[in-house]
Amino acid sequence: MSLRVPQEELSGLRSRNLNELAAQIDWSDSAAGFLTERATFETVLQSVINHDLWFDALSLLAHALAPRQSIWWAYSVCCQWYEVGHATKDDTATSLLDLTRTWVIEPDDETRLKLHDLALAIPNRSPAHWIGMSVFWSTGNITPDAGVVTAPPPYLYARGVSACIDLAASLAGLSRQEVYLGALAAGIDLAGGGEGRVTFQGKAQI
């Protein structure tokens, strides 16, 4: 299975500035070689996908999407991971996913803080943990109990999104390539203004 990145500008991205994005990403040495003077966001994304540099591709797309889009992408992949990976979704994970959907549609700080508490109650080897952390890191104060206001570092949420999807690929019990390609296809669809439906082995999940 191959994946083609549209070479026209993807209209749904928050940023296509490779210099800005590249400064935030821990690139592999192989991926860094594609950051040439004439490169575009789309050509670099296509190159890292063609060379199976999956985490580089996830990171680039997670950073380029707007925070709510990026988190919705991780949420959609995680929902599909539970469906096809036969993982047990306990009450805490169910609550976290339901609340994430609510937050993406209508974000507010109370929900963000609840999602942080739920994330801390889930092991960090679960993709769901990183969705909750991504929401917490996307905006607001990340030291609410310290008596000071600390804004999250720019793009910190994108690291949580990348971790979520990478873990889903590792733990799904399917071909990792199948999961990466399905997730990236959904992310590219979101970046192009689509709904970002995730499909693994012919199954779909909103």
Go through the PLM ranges and name each one.
Residues 131-132:
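Hydrophobic, small-residue-rich transmembrane alpha-helices and their short perimembrane loops
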Residues 1-124, 136, 140-206:
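Short, glycine-biased loop/turn motifs at secondary-structure junctions and
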